[in-house]
Amino acid sequence: MPISGDLIAGALAGLAFVGCSLGNTGPAPSAGRRREVVVNGKRVKTVDIHAHTIVPEAAAVINHPLEAPGLLWSNVSDRIAEMDAEGVDYEALSINPYWYRAERDAAAELIKIQNEKLAEFCAAMPDRFVAFATAALQHPQLAAEQLDYAVKRLGLRGLSIGGSVAGEELANPKFNPVWAKAEELGILIFMHPTGSRELAASGRLDGSGLLTNTIGNPLETTIALSHLIFEGTLDRFPGLKICAAHGGGFLPSYAARSDAVITTFPDRVGPLPKKRPTQYLKDGQLYFDTIMFTGEAMRHLITESGVGQVILGTDYPFPWNKVPVDHILSIPGLSDDDRIAILGGTAAKLLGID
């Protein structure tokens, strides 16, 4: 698909994509034909729920640095080339929250710029991109208003959030206006952790292995989801839909222990949740991306949550899995309908992609 500079020049003003310069990550995608993903002779629409970006003008409002270690800025042709090579038809763009400590006025300005730029870009290439809105969750009523505007006026398809808000849990009742608005709008929330920053401050995640990411990210997701279950947030907002990055962290693998605590230490639980924690994995409120690392891990996630709760994610531009579509196609034991749902069918329904 050739990309016209005239077509995207206006939309790209102020919008940058992050790329990864982690060394020998394989050859760059060649400018070739767009890969079409086929399952049993049927062309499948593929949707990547987990794709990063940033809006420089928004970051400049609070002097957030753009060139963090290990990142470079790619142009849209690079991104399209990688999508085409991998067989990804759509990316759902999201921005990891770096503004959760900003004052109200700065946060309002930042989010306005950010959401409008995302909407401009997606409008220029509606056949390849949709985007999650951003919001200043540290100011919950403002965040609810920002979300309403972003969805109703700008056409953004959901909301991206962190795994906590400046050290506060998402299950804190102060954030209820945001969950109420998301439920009212019927949109999907994409939750991406920010590396267990409060734990990182202790120094326990220092040293080799990039532990703030390697275990910090899935740990923060596990903590956030557990609080949303045990503090009753999912019960209070039964229409809430959350997709958790990185396969939902450790929760799907250890949810049975969360069930067991209800009977082992009943005096430490309640009055909510209304169901066993393992039921929340399957009951339609929680979704999980496919950033897992073996077919067996994916099969376990699907067993614990149900195939309808699992959605293709690539973590673009970070090369955790260089063949994300083939990763799904190669999982043994799935039906054709299962593969189609994971690759894009479920995400297309949640994000309103025709």
What residue ranges belong to the model's regions?
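Mid-to-C-terminal alpha-helical segments outside catalytic/metal-binding sites
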Residues: 2-45, 49, 56-63, 67-90, ...
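Active-site gating/metal-coordination segments in enzymes
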Residues: 20, 89-232
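Hydrophobic faces of well-ordered beta-strands that scaffold small-molecule active sites
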Residues: 47-51, 91-93, 130-133, 159-161, ...
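Active-site environment of divalent metal-dependent phosphoester hydrolases
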Residues: 54-56, 99-101, 138-141, 167, ...
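Short aromatic-enriched loop/helix-cap "lid" or pocket-rim segments at secondary-structure transitions
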Residues: 58-62, 106, 201-204, 254-258, ...
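Short, surface-exposed connector motifs at secondary-structure boundaries
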Residues: 126-131, 155-157, 238, 280-285, ...
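Aromatic-anchored helix/helix-loop segment that forms the rim or "lid"
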Residues: 216, 223, 266-299
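Aromatic-lined glycan-binding groove of carbohydrate-active enzymes
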Residues: 229-283
